[in-house]
Curated annotation (Swiss-Prot):
Lineage, opening ranks: Archaea, Methanobacteriati, Methanobacteriota, Thermococci, Thermococcales
UniProt function note: Releases the supercoiling and torsional tension of DNA, which is introduced during the DNA replication and transcription, by transiently cleaving and rejoining one strand of the DNA duplex. Introduces a single-strand break via transesterification at a target site in duplex DNA. The scissile phosphodiester is attacked by the catalytic tyrosine of the enzyme, resulting in the formation of a DNA-(5'-phosphotyrosyl)-enzyme intermediate and the expulsion of a 3'-OH DNA strand. The free DNA strand then undergoes passage around the unbroken strand, thus removing DNA supercoils.
Name of the protein this chain belongs to: DNA topoisomerase 1
Annotated EC: 5.6.2.1
Positions that bind Mg(2+): 7, 107
UniProt-annotated catalytic positions: 317 (o-(5'-phospho-dna)-tyrosine intermediate)
Length: 686
């Protein structure tokens, strides 16, 4: 018997339906559905994970940071709210004992490979090297049968290792840096406030903060524009002055006066025709930007809808960077099926009449998947939600457009001379629709048809207009623009960028769904980290590790090498952080808990003057000690251990010195008198 492991239950159902030579037998185990099917004389079990079944967690409870000793555990242990995964793990464990062969049929990308790898190793209890791999980019019967007939001999260990490394690095960065920020605030204010950052979150927030600073520091500058309003054939037209900005008001007045005294005439008419080639097929980033422009969908919403269309079998796998459509996709068959839908029939018939279907392609490639395309499976009424209908329409029209003829646009530029000055009037129209006939609803071309102008023609002026304006600050990023910027900077992956943006919203670092504004909290976090530990938010460091993950995938680096290097780099960063922990905590606590709450840790009363004994830090060495709040009038100080959390006890010992509890990073606690001459001091200080 063979066990096929899908990524999600509805994908398991699709695979069972495609591969079974009879009607699939649906069964359940611990309430989890699975399917028994027969193919080519073999009995197959098709079961599923439910996304990630395993996550990372510390091997032991440790208080503090850094922490690097982690392991894979069931996801319901690693994360809250994932209890539903327990039954899926149990089901796979039982089913694995009934079979001799394993096939992974999760999504073919790094995340899918990690899901398959961990399910095999931990739930099924087998060596992942024994499993074969179904590789597909769409959930149609023909694609799934093709994947079955062309099984890969193993899972893609390059992808699996890169995915595992990414998970570990993200855990190291996210958990350790978040603990560091939280501990810093606790040290400064005595309050536990969870604050987080991450390997990609930090650099992403940084470029948003940089834009916010540009906007805040922007000083508007006045300028003037000059327009020539005239009439021709009963219509009004507005021509713009040759300089788009006049910086001096007096110059603007002079130009207006000179134009009014002149007799404006047409000095040139320039007509150009340009071919506009069809757009390239959709990669995920382009789809997210177009869907935001057309429908206002956030990048995450677009990805979620595209994933749903994929799982329903209507479009191909969405997490792709490819802008190419390989020839092994049966374009003609897909278009023949799309022709059954009235809204696409006219365009499909045009394409079916061509001797060859050759798509326009972009430059970007993806080794795992082609560009996004409709599968040719036709949705029935009720199959799609309203938002799914919108995105499906965009995907279909884009697919049809890439095979169509170029559009031809005509642009007209009329030059009007008024004395020594020039004005320009521009128009543009589509003279041959080509691909715009099918995709034009998603493309913004201005259609401005001008009447015929002749050189030397006198212009009937209505008004010479001078308008005062002010320069505007840079625009805030839209969600789609953030995804594009992350792509350009090499931050995150096609699959993670949308979620990183959502996380920044959830953390309270940014706000505004269309125009993203960084909150005071987001500004303060970046300002503080820039000041004390800038490497935490380094775009270069993040990009460097992204490239190393690609090298793991290509087999040119091992995951162990990259994980070890990341550990070393992060250890150094956290060492610097600890030296400035109190200062960082004070800065952050001012905005997180309020300035009034930022107070030093008081461990007792001074036996000499009655002042507060507080934890202080040496500015040169960064080492902590206890001193009197009335310094320099009172010079009482005590040394204190440099490790562990200090907890006051309200008790005293030798000569009125306070007794404190030191809580070690492993959770152990012990009491110590702060007087260095106390008989217990030396024993406890080692």
């Amino acid at each position: 018997m063979i066990l096929i492991i899908a990524e999600k239950p509805n994908v398991a159902r699709k695979i069972a339906g495609a591969l079974s030579e009879r009607r699939p037998i649906k069964k359940s185990l611990f309430g989890v559905p699975y399917y028994e099917i027969f193919r080519e004389g073999k009995k197959l079990i098709v079961a599923s994970a439910v996304g990630h079944l395993y996550g990372l967690a510390p091997k032991r409870d440790v208080f503090g940071y850094p922490i690097f000793d982690i392991e894979w555990v069931p996801v319901y242990i690693a994360e809250k709210g994932k209890e539903y995964a327990r039954e899926y793990i149990k089901a796979l464990s039982v089913l694995a004992k009934r079979v001799r062969e394993f096939i992974v049929a999760c999504d073919y990308d790094t995340e899918g490979e990690v899901i398959g790898y961990t399910a095999l190793k931990y739930a099924c209890g087998v060596d992942p090297r024994v499993a074969k791999r179904m590789k597909f980019s769409a959930l149609t019967k023909r694609d799934l049968l093709n994947a079955w007939r062309n099984l890969e001999p193993t899972i893609n260990f390059g992808m699996a290792n890169a995915g595992i490394a990414r998970h570990i690095l993200d855990w190291y960065w996210g958990v350790n840096l978040s603990r560091a920020l939280t501990h810093a605030i606790k040290k400064a204010s005595g309050k536990w406030v969870v604050l987080s950052t991450g390997r990609v979150q930090g650099p992403t927030l940084k470029f948003l903060v940089e834009r916010e600073r540009e906007i805040q520091s922007f000083v508007p500058r006045p300028y003037w524009v000059i327009k020539l309003i005239f009439e021709k054939n009963g219509q009004k037209f507005t021509a713009n002055y040759e300089k788009d900005k006049i910086w001096e008001e007096e110059e603007g007045k002079r130009i207006v006066l000179e134009v009014k005294k002149s007799i404006p005439r047409v000095s040139n008419v320039e007509i150009k025709r340009q071919k506009r080639t069809p757009p390239h097929p959709f990669d995920l980033g382009t789809l997210q930007r177009e869907a935001y422009s057309a429908f206002g969908f956030s990048p995450k919403k677009t990805l979620d809808i595209a994933q749903s269309l994929y799982e329903k079998g209507f479009s191909s796998y969405p997490r792709t960077e490819s802008q190419k459509l390989p020839r092994n996709i049966n374009f003609r068959m897909i278009i023949q099926n799309l022709a059954k839908m009235p809204q696409y029939r006219p365009y499909a018939h045009i394409l079916l009449g061509l001797p060859e279907l050759k798509p326009v392609e972009g430059k970007k490639e993806d080794p795992a998947h082609p560009a996004i395309y409709p599968t040719g499976e036709i949705p029935r009424p009720g199959d799609l939600t309203k938002d799914e209908e919108k995105l499906y329409d965009m995907i279909v029209r884009r697919f049809l457009a890439v095979f169509m003829e170029p559009a031809i646009r005509e642009s007209v530029k009329v030059t009007i001379r008024a004395g020594p000055h020039k004005f320009f009037l521009s128009g543009g129209r589509t003279v041959k629709k080509g691909w715009l006939s099918v995709y034009g609803k998603y493309v913004k071309f201005e259609e401005v048809t001008l009447p015929e102008f002749f050189i030397g023609e006198r212009i009937k002026v209505i008004q010479v207009k001078r308008e005062k304006k002010k320069t505007k600050p840079p625009a805030r990023y839209s969600p789609a623009a953030v995804i594009k910027k992350m792509e350009d900077l090499g931050l995150g992956t096609k699959a993670t960028r949308a979620q990183i943006l959502e996380t920044l919203y959830q953390r309270g670092y940014i706000e505004g769904k269309k125009s993203i504004k960084v909150t005071p909290l987001g500004m303060k976090v970046i300002e503080t980290l820039e000041k004390y530990v800038p490497e935490i938010i380094s775009v270069e460091l993040t990009r460097e590790f992204e490239k190393k993950m690609e090298l793991i995938m290509e087999g040119r680096l091992t995951k162990e090498e990259v994980i070890e290097e990341a550990k070393e780099r992060l250890t150094k960063i956290l060492e610097e952080f600890k030296k400035r922990e109190l200062e960082i905590g004070i800065e952050l606590a001012k905005i997180v808990v309020g300035e009034d709450e930022v107070k030093p840790l008081v461990v007792g009363k001074c036996p000499k003057c009655g002042g507060d004994l507080i934890v202080k830090y040496n500015k040169k060495t960064g080492k902590r000690f206890v001193g009197c709040s009335n310094w320099p009038k009172c010079d009482v100080t005590y040394p204190i251990l440099q490790r562990g959390e200090i907890i006051p006890t309200n008790k005293t010992c030798c000569n009125g010195a306070p007794v404190v509890i030191i809580r070690e990073e492993d959770g152990r606690e012990f009491e110590i008198c702060l007087d260095i001459n106390c008989k217990d001091w030396k024993a406890k200080s080692h």
